[in-house]
A protein has these predicted regions:
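Conserved SAM-binding loop of SAM-dependent methyltransferases across substrates and taxa
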Residues: 78-89
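A short acidic, Gly/Pro-enriched loop at the edge of an enzyme's catalytic core
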Residues: 127-134
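N-terminal auxiliary segments of SAM/dcSAM-dependent transferases
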Residues: 1-24
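Conserved SAM/SAH-binding beta-strand->alpha-helix loop
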Residues: 98-100
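Conserved class I S-adenosyl-L-methionine
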Residues: 168-183
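Conserved SAM-binding loop and adjacent beta-strand
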Residues: 24, 28, 40-57
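Conserved SAM-binding strand-loop segment of SAM-dependent methyltransferases
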Residues: 111-125
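A short glycine-rich, Lys/Arg-flanked "PGG" loop and its adjoining helix->strand segment in the class I
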Residues: 151-163
């Protein structure tokens, strides 16, 4: 009995459990996550509005986003970036696990008259014949993946990219990890 309790209370190894499905598809959790995405002053599910505005300005300028740019945004959430890419006349696909966030993103696109292809799916399983110029994965999603999942994502990205295409990953620096203390 003590051995079982010890096992139950032991710290799991990094990436021992993959809980994305539970996190993004549970109705209560998904509702709160969407609220956090849409709160413009917090850096929880999405960056704060000022950061998003500054980063979008840089992304659009740096990658020359416009009429013929094809973009896939992995972990797009409620479309905070995809909407603005589409407003620059880019051809945009957003992929996210959360049905609630995808529904919100689709409603926003419809209301604004934007043609954005939203896919509600675990982005680790996303496949398409379409090739893209830019892949984005914003808000440190890449950091949450195991080394095996990261390799799978990068391999998938390679297959999706047009010649000369780019990948933009928003990741924590090693310095940011050093400043955190696990409790």
């Amino acid at each position: 009995m003590f051995k079982e309790l010890e096992e139950i209370n032991s710290r799991p190894a990094p990436f021992q459990f993959y809980t994305a499905k539970e996190l993004w598809t549970d109705e209560h959790t998904a509702k709160k996550m969407l609220e956090y995405h849409l709160n413009e002053s917090l850096d929880l599910s999405s960056r704060n509005k000022d950061f998003i505005d500054r980063s979008l300005k840089w992304i659009v300028s740096h990658f020359g986003i416009g009429v013929n740019t094809i973009i896939a945004d992995f972990g797009c959430g409620p479309g905070l970036y995809t909407t603005q890419f589409a407003e620059k006349n880019a051809d945009v696909t957003g992929i996210d696990f959360s049905e609630r966030s995808i529904r919100y993103a689709k409603e926003t696109a419809t209301r604004k008259g934007l043609n954005i292809d939203y896919v509600c799916q675990n982005y680790l399983e996303f496949e398409t014949e379409k090739r893209v110029d830019l892949i984005t994965m914003i808000m440190c999603d890449f950091c949450a993946l195991s080394p095996t999942q990261r390799k799978k994502m990068l391999t998938g990205f390679y297959r999706l990219l047009n010649a000369g295409g780019s990948v933009l990953l928003d990741v924590y620096s090693l310095n940011a990890f050093d400043q955190r203390e696990e409790v």
